[in-house]
């Protein structure tokens, strides 16, 4: 379909989004103040209970407390932790709530596991109005903004047929330079640049970050066939549940370099397939000797295998489909490097455990502590855990380890022959 003007394209996109899981009602021309009130209304509906808002709405002062926390965090990386942390604390200043007045309460803002369920809300804001830093510039208007539970998390810029998608990327970059993605709009995690024949998506680099076209990605299907047409792209990536999962599971706040990352389509396909495989595993004793095949993460050099393997492990751990996920390395230096990367990818409430020696590894494999779920070790250390009496292990220890549901992710498995 050929679009001679951008408005026709925008009309059709906005009409299509409700067919893939977004709400029918569209927020037209909302500025930050109106979007903040919309967020307040959703927070109230999702937190009316006696232990939270006690059926008394949020005041402007309480919403400003939340907005100040957003402004203080500032970067998309830290705000990713805010969103996926699931809750926010405020001090009640609504005098009508005599039970909580002057006290701190916790409000639920988002649950990445409540996908198209529970209290999740999916809204479309059309032509959102941005305030710019400079007094001599007019305030900006975006094309389409997608909100989850009132938070703007995906911003879309459109261009008509015949206009390169790079111009939509440039428009996003221009808005960022003018200070449009600050305040409430700094919650945006992912940008989408789209014309009818091509679409790109990329992580928000933040106010001090750099827009790098090397990290503007095309989406692709399971067979890595590119999905360029706007309608197929919308159905695949911007639909619910996928958009919810993209924000909750397939963005990575990398503390090692301070940059928010979004996974490429092949990384998503691999991590999702691995997690799905583990969810269908049969752990009963009669099935353990059966031919339950695993799989390979088949990426080229430099294409993000480490992130894919970590995200696979994180998904498995989050789903509780295994008790332990063990990253096996065939060289000590690889283990040290990978441990650093995995810890960079890990969220604030996640631990990635090192194993200084075989005894430490054995202790973590026996442990029931949630902090000991993700473990990095070497094939050499793992191969040492075989016999009773070695490394202080007794029959009960070995049996305890055997009773665990353990998933192994082997780095460079094509060349790992030891053990």
Sequence positions of predicted segments:
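ATP-dependent helicase/translocase motor core
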Residues: 1-324, 329, 333, 337-349, ...
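Short beta-alpha junctions and helix-cap segments that line functional grooves
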Residues: 312, 341, 357, 361-364, ...
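Conserved helicase motor
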Residues: 332, 354-364, 379-384
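Short, charged, low-hydrophobicity "junction" segments
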Residues: 347-360, 409
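Conserved motor-coupling elements within RecA-like helicase/translocase cores
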Residues: 358-375, 400
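Conserved RecA-like ASCE ATPase "motif II neighborhood" in helicase/translocase motors
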Residues: 374-412, 416-419
């Amino acid at each position: 379909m050929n679009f001679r003007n951008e408005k026709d394209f925008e009309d059709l996109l906005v009409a299509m989004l409700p067919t893939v899981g977004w709400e029918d009602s569209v927020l037209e021309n909302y500025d930050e103040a109106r979007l903040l009130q919309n967020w307040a209304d959703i927070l109230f509906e999702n937190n009316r209970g006696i232990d939270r808002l006690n059926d008394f709405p949020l005041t402007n002062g309480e919403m400003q407390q939340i907005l100040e926390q957003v402004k203080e965090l500032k970067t998309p990386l830290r705000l990713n932790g805010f969103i996926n942390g699931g809750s926010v604390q405020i001090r009640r200043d609504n005098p009508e709530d005599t039970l909580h007045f002057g006290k701190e309460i916790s409000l639920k803002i988002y649950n990445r596991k409540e996908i198209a369920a529970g209290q999740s809300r999916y809204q479309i804001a059309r032509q959102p109005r941005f305030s710019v830093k400079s007094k001599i510039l007019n305030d900006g208007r975006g094309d389409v903004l997608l909100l989850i539970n009132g938070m703007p998390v995906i911003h879309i810029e459109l261009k008509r047929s015949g206009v390169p998608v790079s111009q939509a990327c440039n428009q996003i970059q221009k808005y960022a330079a003018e200070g449009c993605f600050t305040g409430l709009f700094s919650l945006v995690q992912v940008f989408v640049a789209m014309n009818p024949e091509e679409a790109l998506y990329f992580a928000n680099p933040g106010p001090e970050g750099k827009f790098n076209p090397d990290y503007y990605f095309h989406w692709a299907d399971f067979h890595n066939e590119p999905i360029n047409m706007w309608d197929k792209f919308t159905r695949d990536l911007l639909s619910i549940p996928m958009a919810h999962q993209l924000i909750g599971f397939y963005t990575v706040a990398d503390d090692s370099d301070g940059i928010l990352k979004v996974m490429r389509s092949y990384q998503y396909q691999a991590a999702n397939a691995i997690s799905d495989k583990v969810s269908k595993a049969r752990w009963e004793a009669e099935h353990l000797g059966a031919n339950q095949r695993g799989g390979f993460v088949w990426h080229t050099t430099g294409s993000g295998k480490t992130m894919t393997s970590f995200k696979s492990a994180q998904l498995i751990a989050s789903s509780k489909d295994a008790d332990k996920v063990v990253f096996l390395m065939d060289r000590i230096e690889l283990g040290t490097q990978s441990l650093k990367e995995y810890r960079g990818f890990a969220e604030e409430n996640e631990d990635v455990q090192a194993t200084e020696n075989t005894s430490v590894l054995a202790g973590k494999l026996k442990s029931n502590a949630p902090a000991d779920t993700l473990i990095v070790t070497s094939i050499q250390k793992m191969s040492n855990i075989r016999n009773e009496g070695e490394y202080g292990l007794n029959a009960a220890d070995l049996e305890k380890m055997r009773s665990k549901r353990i998933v192994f992710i082997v780095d460079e498995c094509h060349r790992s022959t030891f053990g």
